[in-house]
A protein has these predicted regions:
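N-terminal secretory signal peptides that target proteins for export/translocation
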Residues: 1-5
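Short acidic, Pro/Gly- and aromatic-enriched capping/linker segments at domain boundaries
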Residues: 38-50, 177-178
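Bacterial lipoprotein signal-peptidase II cleavage site
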Residues: 21-26
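Conserved beta-strand hairpin/beta-sheet module of binuclear metal-dependent hydrolase folds
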Residues: 45-96
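Sec-dependent signal peptide recognition
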Residues: 6-13
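Short glycine- and acidic-rich boundary segments immediately preceding or forming the N-terminal edge
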Residues: 28-42
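C-terminal motif of bacterial Sec signal peptides marking the signal peptidase cleavage site
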Residues: 16-19
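Active-site HxH/HxHxD metal-binding segment of metal-dependent hydrolases
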Residues: 92-179
Length: 179
């Protein structure tokens, strides 16, 4: 038994010395971006699309599209992008088409990329807001309580820590806004 323990110790010591041998550096190669993902980026080209008379959608400015519905005297906006900066850019385009005041803002759901640009679209008017009854609760919770963990997870999920040239798109839009 004693000699068996010595043999095990000796084998462990030999293993330790062998594992401390000179190491080689492995070269890291940049992973290839799949062609389908590159082609998918074409879906998010920045453009203003006229869907039909009086209905326009801004695509590629944020994760969520923003829609203008023209009225005779007032306009309706569906989803307001994820930041004031992007909302300003989209609003300026919409105003070039029809500068009527925004009477109504509709949120399709309570995510930041659909709601955080609302103050820009509401400027100069007091629009009615149409949303699910829980939208205010969820937005308040995200802003006040969950923001650190949501931000951390979103940044990791959408690749915000990667260099810009390594991010092709975010699957549902060009990039995640941090608004």
């Amino acid at each position: 038994m004693f000699s068996m323990m010595r043999q095990i110790k000796l084998l462990l010591i030999i293993q330790l010395f062998l594992s401390c041998s000179e190491t080689t550096t492995l070269e890291s190669t940049k992973p290839q971006t799949p062609e389908d993902l590159i082609a998918h980026s074409d879906e998010f080209k920045r453009e203003l699309i006229t869907v039909t008379d009086g209905v326009h959608v801004a695509v590629g400015y944020a994760l969520a599209n923003s829609i203008l519905i023209e009225g005779e005297k007032t306009n309706i906006i569906i989803d307001t992008t994820g930041s004031e900066e992007t909302a300003k850019e989209v609003k300026d385009m919409f105003d070039a088409i029809n500068s009527n005041p925004v009477e109504t803002i509709i949120y399709t759901h309570n995510h930041a990329d659909h709601t955080y640009g609302a103050t820009v679209f509401a400027e100069g008017s007091n629009p009615d807001i149409y949303a699910h009854s829980t939208t205010e609760i969820y937005l308040s919770r995200v802003i006040g309580i969950l923001r650190p963990i949501i931000s951390s997870r979103s940044n990791r999920m959408f690749g915000n820590a990667l260099p810009k040239e390594q991010v092709e798109n975010n699957g549902i839009g060009p990039f995640l806004e941090i608004g």
